[in-house]
Amino acid sequence: MIKIDVVSECTLWSKKIKRNKTFFNSILKFFPKKYKFIGKKINLTILLSNNKNIKKLNKDFRNKNKPTDVLSFPFEKKFNPKKSNYLGDIVISYEFMNKPKNISILEFKQKVVKIFIHGFLHLLGHDHIKLKDFKKMIKEEDLIYKFIKTKVA
């Protein structure tokens, strides 16, 4: 079982997602079984942020002086539920999710679901630096999204 802590440092998030912890828990509820870590107590933190703060994190930790949609900070390089109970942190930028500005709440939530899946896979050790890894990660993202797209949002 995965326990999520959600911290919001940007009040704009509450305009699109009223109960953010419930929202993210509902996403995890529909993940494929292999990602549920049944019988384990696994934790992760989500920081709902904005472009200003995610840009600072991106500069500090990746040496890229620009905002981005999501950052993942895995607790371990490759997560092993037998050795650790903390996956890591996912930071998501409101402005990236809210493009275009007239995006509907449903479309906003769908984007958040997709980017959460992406960040979650990074916490598990997936990466997309090499083309073959990119293809593998995209395939896995699509598989998870198909599991949950009609059930969440």
From Swiss-Prot:
Cofactor annotation comment: Binds 1 zinc ion.
Keyword rRNA processing appears in the UniProt entry: yes
Record Pfam families: YbeY
Required cofactor names: Zn(2+)
InterPro entries per the UniProt record, alphabetical: MetalPrtase_cat_dom_sf_prd (IPR023091), YbeY (IPR002036), YbeY_CS (IPR020549)
Location of the protein in the cell: Cytoplasm
Protein family: Belongs to the endoribonuclease YbeY family.
Record's protein name: Endoribonuclease YbeY
Gene name for this UniProt entry: ybeY
